[in-house]
Design a protein with these regions (language model features):
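Structured mid-to-C-terminal alpha-helical surface segments
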Residues: 1-48, 57-66, 70-279
């Protein structure tokens, strides 16, 4: 068990060198893991379903994807600000001998380009005097197809895993594919494009095409974008040919070293191949 900030910083410094990852991001990731373990031991362990960047990073490795927050959906419940407040209070009160304290700073409705309505919880953690900001986005009503899965989440600094519920691979891919198709050149989130590429490269053999097709249709139906799917090939051509999109990709490459060697064309070809599995 990590007992001091100095010990934690030393471990993270060494890991950042080995993984070529930013130490500040790794520190935040460690604190997100502390929250995730509390979820796994809480009364909400069967309602919280991990998705988003933290799940993708776990699937592909921290040296291939970084993330700054936790995305989750809550199953079988409507989550407003009051419900979220009660839920988070219960989770952070789970007793764990890790010395980490959580403080909720703000709870608000998500208004920024969200595919689903939800709640954003801004927190900070404190460990041996070190304060780290944390953000959790919680949604409800997501179309998980065919269903969520049990996921063994490997901890960053310990040789063990925690068992949580998570999106299945096909739903992770379907949500990002739908976003790429429906938003076309208005989607400035280059991580969607990168995630589709890296997941297809590292987990392509695990993809079940029928499940990916069903998940894509279910996601589009939920978001009211079914009519866009038939025009996906044209959308991909438009996206790849758009000079601003390629400029955004180059900026993403400069920011994240793990994307350095990936051409825009290579990424778009991966996305075309993924979409082809749904046909």
């Amino acid at each position: 068990m990590i007992k001091s900030a100095r010990q934690l910083k030393d471990l993270i410094r060494n890991l950042s060198k080995n993984k070529s990852a930013d130490a500040q991001i790794l520190m935040r990731n460690y604190m997100m893991e502390r929250f995730l373990e509390r979820i796994s031991l809480s009364e909400y362990r069967d309602k919280f379903i991990l998705k988003g960047g933290m799940l993708v990073a776990a699937m592909v490795g921290l040296d291939a994807r970084s993330t700054m927050d936790i995305d989750a959906t809550v199953k079988g419940a409507t989550v407003g600000i009051e419900e979220a407040e009660n839920m988070i209070a219960s989770i952070v009160s789970v007793p764990l001998d890790d010395g980490v304290e959580f403080r909720v700073k703000r709870i608000s409705e998500i208004m920024d380009e969200a595919e689903y309505p939800g709640i954003r919880v801004s927190m900070e953690t404190e460990f041996d005097g070190v304060v780290t900001p944390l953000k959790i986005d919680i949604s409800t009503g997501d179309a998980i197809t065919p269903r969520e899965v049990r996921y063994s989440f490997k901890l960053m600094l310990e040789d063990r895993s925690i068992e949580i519920w998570a999106y299945n691979l096909e739903t992770v891919l379907a949500e990002k594919l739908e976003t790429v198709v429906s938003r076309a050149t208005t989607n400035t989130r280059m991580r969607d494009f990168y995630d589709l590429h890296i997941l297809s490269q590292l987990h392509g053999e695990s993809i079940i095409p029928a499940d990916l097709r069903a998940a894509l249709i279910a996601t589009a139906r939920k978001r009211g974008t079914e009519n866009y799917l038939a025009d996906a090939p044209a959308a991909f051509d438009e996206i790849e040919a758009d000079s601003n999109m390629e400029k955004l990709w180059r900026a993403y490459q400069k920011k994240f070293a793990y994307a350095n060697d990936l051409s825009w064309h290579t990424v778009m070809e991966s996305i075309r191949s993924l979409y082809g599995l749904t046909q």
